[in-house]
A protein has these predicted regions:
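Metal-cofactor-dependent catalytic cores
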Residues: 1-116
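Non-catalytic beta/alpha edge segments that cap or flank active sites
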Residues: 109-110, 114-208
Length: 208
C-alpha cells in the first residue's frame, strides 16, 4: 500500500480486520470505533477471517493477497486503544497478507476467499511392501500422526501415500516431482538400515 508504514518486501504488507470482530469488541468495551482505529488497512464484512489459514488467498478484483499470519504481538502501552480499554482486538483477530498481484481496490469491493491445501506426501521405501508380500504399515502410521498434528488447527493437509521399491532412481524421481509440483512436506519412511538397498538417506541428502 503506497505510503503505508508496512509497505516493503516482507510478509505483513496488508492487514485486515473483520467488522464483526470490531463490533464484538466495541460491545464489550462499551464504546464505538471508526474504520482504521486498529490500524487495519482493510475492514471486511461477511467473511470469516478467523476461519482462514496461512497460504489461503484473498482476491479483491485484480488484487491477489496471500495470508501469511494470524494475529500479532500486542504493543501494550504503545497502543492507544490498549491504554484506554486495557485490551485490543487486532492481536487476536486480525490477519496479515503479502501482495501477490497489485492493483486498486475501493470500498464495497467483493472479496473471494480461496482455500489452500498443504500438499503432504508420504513415501514408503520397501521392496516387499511394493511387491505385495506384506502390507505397508509405516505409511498409514505416519498419516495418522500427521492428521493428529493438524487436528483442530487452521492448516488443511492433503495427504497422499506412495509405496516404492528400495530403488534410488524411483525415490529420486518422486522427490524431484514433489519439489517441482510445490509439495509442502515430504516424509519418507523405510530404507534407512545398513543393507545394500537401504538408499533413502543418500538420495535425500543428494537433493537437499
Amino acid at each position: 500500500i503506497k505510503g503505508d508504514a508496512h509497505a516493503g518486501v516482507w510478509h505483513r504488507q496488508v492487514s485486515l480486520l473483520a467488522l464483526e470482530s470490531i463490533e464484538r469488541f466495541a460491545a464489550a468495551a462499551g464504546r464505538t470505533f471508526a474504520y482504521g482505529d486498529f490500524a487495519e488497512n482493510i475492514t471486511t464484512r461477511g467473511i470469516d477471517l478467523l476461519a482462514t489459514a496461512v497460504f489461503d488467498r484473498l482476491s479483491i478484483g485484480e488484487v491477489e493477497l496471500e495470508i501469511t499470519q494470524h494475529g500479532k504481538k500486542c504493543h501494550g502501552d504503545d497502543c492507544a486503544i490498549f491504554r484506554e480499554v486495557g485490551r485490543c482486538v487486532m492481536p487476536h483477530e486480525g490477519i496479515f497478507c503479502r501482495v501477490l498481484q497489485g492493483g486498486t481496490i475501493k470500498a464495497g469491493d467483493s472479496i473471494v476467499h480461496q482455500l489452500h491445501y498443504l500438499d503432504c506426501r508420504i513415501i514408503t521405501l520397501s521392496d516387499r511392501a511394493h511387491q505385495g508380500v506384506y502390507e505397508d504399515l509405516s505409511g498409514p502410521r505416519v498419516r495418522k500422526h500427521l492428521e493428529e498434528l493438524f487436528s483442530g488447527k487452521r492448516g488443511r493437509p492433503r495427504i497422499t501415500m506412495q509405496v516404492l521399491p528400495d530403488d534410488a532412481e524411483a525415490l529420486r524421481a518422486a522427490l524431484v516431482a514433489a519439489r517441482d509440483e510445490g509439495a509442502a512436506l515430504v516424509i519418507t519412511t523405510g530404507g534407512t538400515g545398513i543393507g545394500p538397498r537401504d538408499i533413502t538417506p543418500d538420495v535425500v541428502l543428494a537433493l537437499a
